[in-house]
Amino acid sequence: MNKEREARKYLRLLSVRRCRHIATIVELVREVIEPAILAPYELVDIEYGKMGGDYVLSVFVDKPEGITVNDTADLTDIISPLLDQIKPDPFPEQYFLEVTSPGLERPLKTKEQLADAVGSYIHVSLYKAVDKQKVFEGTLLSFEEDVLHMEYLDKTRRKEVEIPYSLVSKARLAVKF
């Protein structure tokens, strides 16, 4: 029983260390490549982790009129040499670099991205329930003073809700059906 508890504790510690290491890699990559991604491009997000048996560094970029395959190829040519110059190499194993569009349901990770999304249909997950709900999908009417003001459908009735930014665990654009 005691060995089992120790094993669980050790696995949790490894998991925390791995998460911290991944967060450090993402922060370092952002610091190195963000200055090189010039207008009209926008660095939306960076993710690093295992996909199947391989490590993948995903760099999500966008521009106002949308990103093309040629754009991602050009940005890969800019980003890859910058990553190769990082010393010491922060990556524990070989990885694939993927420069891609954030897609239709792009994440909204910063206050600036939320402010830019006013008028858009979004999906929001919360740490704590507001009006007995932890998930909302609807139109972002405004984002002022760290409060999201949304309109959503509750069955067939339109409702409005105010959500403190501090309660938002994840937000992304959503496709309205």
From Swiss-Prot:
GO cellular component: cytosol
Localization, UniProt: Cytoplasm
Keywords linked to the UniProt accession: Cytoplasm, Ribosome biogenesis
One BP term from GO: ribosomal small subunit assembly
Main location: cytoplasm
Classification via CDD domains: YlxS_C
Domain of life: Bacteria
Family according to the record: Belongs to the RimP family.
Function field: Required for maturation of 30S ribosomal subunits.
Name used for this protein in its record: Ribosome maturation factor RimP
Record organism: Streptococcus sanguinis (strain SK36)
Annotated gene: rimP
